[in-house]
Amino acid sequence: MPGMLLVLLVTLSLYLVTMPQTITLEDAGLFQMICHKGGIGHPPGYPLFILSCQAFVNLPVFEQDVVAGNLMSALFASAACSVLLIVLRQLQVTGLLSVSLALVYGLSATFWSQAIIVEVYSLAVLLFLICLSLSLAYRDSEQVKYLLWLALVYGLALSNHWPLQGLGTPALLAILAPKARLIVRFLLVPANFLAI
C-alpha cells in the first residue's frame, strides 16, 4: 500500500530529525540504563519492551548508545501510524482522508513527544492497533486465524503495558461481541480436549 509507506516514511523521517541525541526526562534515563545494562523497570516492569530494547541496542550498528533506544521507539511509533492507516481503511475511511488522519495522529504533540524517546508507549500503541485491526478482520471474515493472532498479540500487549491494554479492551470486546457464539464454540473444542 503506497499510503502505508508514505505514512511510515514521513513520520519516521520527522522523528529521526527531532530525536534527542542524549538522555531526556521522564523514564528515559531508567529505560536507557536497563536496555544497556539489564534489569527490571519500575512496576509493572515492561518485560516485552525491555527485552526488545536490550536486543535492539546490542545490534552492532549504533555509534551512540542513547540513539539506539530512541530509534527503537521511533520505529514502533511509525509502524503504529501505518497500522492505524490499516484500521482506518478497515473502517471504510479511504483515500487521502485515511492517510491524513494517520499522519495527524503521528504528528500530534503528545504522540510525537513519546515517539522520539525510549519509552513504552509507542510499542503499546502499536500492539493495541494491531489488536484492533485483527478484531476488525475477524469481525469481517470470521476466519479463526485472526482470533488466534489476536490472542497472541493481546498477550504480548499485556506484557508490555497492561494498564493501557486494559483501557482498550472494552473496544475490542465491543467489536467481537456480535461473534461471541462463534468464539465460545471455538474455545470449547480445546477445553473439551483438556477435560479428557
Residue ranges and their predicted role:
Residues R89-Q92, A115, C131-L147, Y154-A157, ...:
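Membrane-interface transmembrane helices that cradle and orient dolichyl/undecaprenyl
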Residues P2-L6, L84-L107, V125-L126, K145, ...:
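Transmembrane-helix signature of polytopic, membrane-embedded enzymes
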Residues I34-K37, L101-L103, Y146-N160, L172-A174:
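Membrane-interface alpha helices of multi-pass inner-membrane proteins
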Residues T110-Y121:
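Short acidic/glycine- and proline-prone juxtamembrane loop motifs at membrane-interface regions
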Residues L167-I196:
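Perimembrane helix-loop-helix junctions
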Residues M1-L25, A195-I196:
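Transmembrane signal-anchor helices characteristic of membrane glycosylation enzymes that use polyprenol
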Residues C35-E63, A74-L75:
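Short hydrophobic/aromatic helix or loop-helix immediately within or flanking a transmembrane segment
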Residues L5, L9, L71-Q92, I130-L134:
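Transmembrane-helix motifs of polytopic, lipid-linked glycan transferases
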